[in-house]
């Protein structure tokens, strides 16, 4: 099994609601990061085997495989594929794991992983809210889920409470872990 290495990292400035990045199309924002990463690392575009981006709200400007659209908006060759991952808050982290797995399994050599969201254009939850408005139903009331989890109203909050109860995590345990994690990131 091969090894995977992170050889470069690029990000846009942190944005805020209706801030300076609000009018950037998500594909163009992703393309900016792709082009800068290739520039900084000296990689040749044709050497890139894949682009994997996390994106939670894949609707509106972020629909239609935003990772591939970012590739097409970038200077990378059209031959470079791209795929988008939705693992909710862990989407970009999952993209990195998928990239590492591809390299470690030796099925790919160079993979760019990251994520893109322009929440001023596609606010959190808008993909579900818009679906409700259009009468397309909701994602958490399939027969199998309703039978397996009777009376459970699914949300990140309910899920967090269920996991804390099941694994016996106290609020203090979780706060301490979150504080330690945040401290490592700064």
Residue ranges and their predicted role:
Residues 5, 52, 84:
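Conserved beta-strand segments that form the floor/walls of ligand-binding pockets within enzyme
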Residues 1-15:
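N-terminal amphipathic/basic leader segments beginning at the initiator methionine
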Residues 7, 53, 114:
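Short glycine/serine/threonine-enriched helix-capping/active-site loop
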Residues 2, 16-47, 60-66, 71-186:
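Acyl-thioester C-C bond-transforming condensing/cleaving domain
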């Amino acid at each position: 099994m091969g090894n995977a290495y992170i050889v470069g990292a690029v990000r846009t400035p942190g944005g805020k609601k209706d801030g300076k990045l609000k009018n950037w199309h998500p594909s163009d924002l992703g393309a900016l990061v792709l082009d800068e990463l290739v520039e900084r690392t000296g990689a040749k575009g044709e050497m890139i085997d894949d682009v994997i981006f996390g994106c939670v709200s894949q609707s509106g400007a972020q629909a239609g495989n935003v990772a591939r659209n970012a590739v097409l908006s970038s200077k990378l060759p059209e031959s470079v594929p791209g795929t988008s991952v939705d693992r909710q808050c862990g989407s970009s982290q999952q993209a990195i794991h998928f990239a590492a797995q591809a390299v470690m399994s030796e099925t790919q050599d160079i993979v760019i992983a990251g994520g893109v969201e322009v929440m001023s254009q596609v606010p959190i939850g808008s993909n579900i809210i818009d679906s409700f408005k259009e009468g397309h139903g909701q994602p958490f009331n399939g027969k199998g889920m309703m039978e397996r989890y009777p009376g459970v109203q699914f949300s990140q909050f309910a899920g967090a409470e269920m996991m804390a109860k099941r694994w016996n995590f106290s609020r203090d345990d979780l706060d301490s872990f979150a504080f330690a994690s945040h401290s490592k990131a700064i």
